[in-house]
């Protein structure tokens, strides 16, 4: 199942400049998600990282993988919205074994591949990787917490 930017924005609270997923190519319920981020020279972080040699910060590549994981968690088996995203927070609470293999530069298309390792109502663990042109540029184990915003 695919998600366009409208469906992504229904599920994630992130907005420019922190929305780092442009399209979801596939979701296999309970298993995995594949999404993309088109990296443009117009990204605000390129202004200072680095002006004469623009490179996407690794922390933002990791955030893009975490946003893909959140989209996976907020999408039910039929492709619908699993919960009210306005009343639910999805926090990145752990990053293990993060590796950055090569720079991501303007013009690249990040392919975000996230596999579920453990899913529960409160904590989810994932194996994530980002690829450009079929080559792994980053990978990490992610742990995310799902919290209700209603007190």
From Swiss-Prot:
Organism annotation: Bordetella petrii (strain ATCC BAA-461 / DSM 12804 / CCUG 43448)
Catalytic activity: a (3R)-hydroxyacyl-[ACP] = a (2E)-enoyl-[ACP] + H2O
EC number, as in UniProt: 4.2.1.59
Keywords (A to Z) from UniProt: Cytoplasm, Lipid A biosynthesis, Lipid biosynthesis, Lipid metabolism, Lyase
One Pfam family recorded for the sequence: FabA
Name assigned to this protein: 3-hydroxyacyl-[acyl-carrier-protein] dehydratase FabZ
A GO biological-process term: lipid A biosynthetic process
HAMAP family: FabZ (MF_00406)
Biological role stated in the UniProt entry: Involved in unsaturated fatty acids biosynthesis. Catalyzes the dehydration of short chain beta-hydroxyacyl-ACPs and long chain saturated and unsaturated beta-hydroxyacyl-ACPs.
Oxidoreductase among keywords: no
Cell compartments where the protein resides: Cytoplasm
Residues of the active site: 49
GO MF annotation terms: (3R)-hydroxyacyl-[acyl-carrier-protein] dehydratase activity
The family this protein is said to belong to: Belongs to the thioester dehydratase family. FabZ subfamily.
NCBIfam families in alphabetical order: fabZ, PRK00006.1
InterPro entries with a match to the protein in the record: FabA_FabZ (IPR013114), FabZ (IPR010084), HotDog_dom_sf (IPR029069)
Record keyword Ion transport present: no
């Amino acid at each position: 199942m695919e998600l366009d930017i409208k469906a992504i924005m229904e599920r994630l609270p992130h907005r420019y400049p922190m929305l780092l997923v442009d399209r979801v190519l596939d979701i296999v319920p309970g298993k995995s998600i594949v999404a993309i981020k088109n990296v443009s020279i117009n990204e605000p972080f390129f202004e200072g990282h680095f002006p004469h040699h623009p490179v996407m910060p690794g922390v933002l590549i990791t955030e893009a993988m975490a946003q893909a994981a959140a989209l996976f968690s907020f999408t039910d088996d039929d492709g619908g919205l699993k919960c009210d995203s306005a009343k639910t927070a999805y926090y990145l609470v752990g990053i293990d074994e993060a590796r950055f293999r090569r720079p991501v530069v303007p013009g690249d298309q990040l392919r975000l591949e996230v596999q579920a390792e453990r899913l529960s109502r409160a904590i989810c663990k994932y194996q994530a990787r980002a690829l450009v042109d079929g080559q792994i540029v980053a990978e990490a184990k992610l742990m995310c917490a799902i919290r209700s915003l209603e007190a």
